[in-house]
Each structure stands twice: as C-alpha cells, then as structure tokens.
C-alpha cells in the first residue's frame, strides 16, 4: 500500500 512517508513508517512499525 503506497500512501506516504507516514504510511510507510506505520506499516514498517506494524510489521
């Protein structure tokens, strides 16, 4: 899912 820096960080943090 591509959204933005925040989205990328959130996904990485969740993982």
Curated annotation (Swiss-Prot):
Self-association and partners:
Monomer.
Q: Which UniProt keywords apply?
A: Disulfide bond, Glycoprotein, Hydrolase, Protease, Secreted, Serine protease, Toxin
Localization terms from the record: Secreted
According to its UniProt entry, the protein's GO biological process terms are: proteolysis
Question: Does this entry carry the keyword Chaperone?
Answer: no
Found, by tissue, as follows: Expressed by the venom gland.
What's the superkingdom here?
Eukaryota
- What's a GO cellular component annotated to this UniProt protein? extracellular region
The record's similarity note reads:
Belongs to the peptidase S1 family. Snake venom subfamily.
Q: EC number(s) on record?
A: 3.4.21.-
Q: How does activity depend on temperature?
A: Optimum temperature is 30-40 degrees Celsius.
**Domain called Peptidase S1: residue spans:** 1-15
What does its activity-regulation comment describe? Inhibited by PMSF, Fe(3+), Fe(2+), Cu(2+), Cd(2+), Mn(2+), and Al(3+). Not inhibited by Ca(2+) and Mg(2+) and EDTA.
Q: What is this protein called?
A: Snake venom serine protease AHP-Ka
User: What organism is this sequence from?
Assistant: Gloydius halys (Chinese water mocassin)
* GO molecular function annotations of the record: serine-type peptidase activity; toxin activity
């Amino acid at each position: 899912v591509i959204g933005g820096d925040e989205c990328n960080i959130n996904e990485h943090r969740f993982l």
